[in-house]
Amino acid sequence: MIYRELSQAEFNDLASRILYEDNHLLVVNKKVGEIVQGDKTSDEPLTETYKAFIAQRDAKPGQVFMGLPHRLDRPVSGIVVLAKTSKALERLNAMFRDSDVHKFYWALVCAEPRPAEGSSLSVGFGECPHTPLSLNSFFNK
C-alpha cells in the first residue's frame, strides 16, 4: 500500500508526539480537534496519519498495521495507545474489556467549578489561557 508523503514539518510534529514505542505499541499525544478513527468527514484519522509516518520513517513498502483499542473524541486531547500488531490489539482489547486499564481524566477550566452533590473535586493551580475546555486521558496499568 502506498501512503501519502508527510511534509518535514508534519513528520517532525508526529515524531515529537510519540511518548512510547516498541515493536507492539505506539503511544502518542493526541491534539484537540484530531480524530482517531475514520468518520463521515474527510478528515484523516490519527491511525492513518501514523501509518504514513511509520511507512515513511521505516521506508516500509508494504501495509502498516495500526489497531485502535480505544478512542478519544475529537474535542479531547490526551494519550492514545495504538497497536502495531494484531496480537497487541487483541491483548489491549482484552485489557480494556476487563477493566485492566485505568483511565484518568483532567479538565482545565478558567473558573473554579462546584462539584455536584455526592461527588468530589480536586482543584489545582495554574495559568488560565482563554481557550476551549481540554480534557486529558492518561492510562496506566
Model region roles, listed by residue range:
Residues M1-K141:
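RNA pseudouridine synthases
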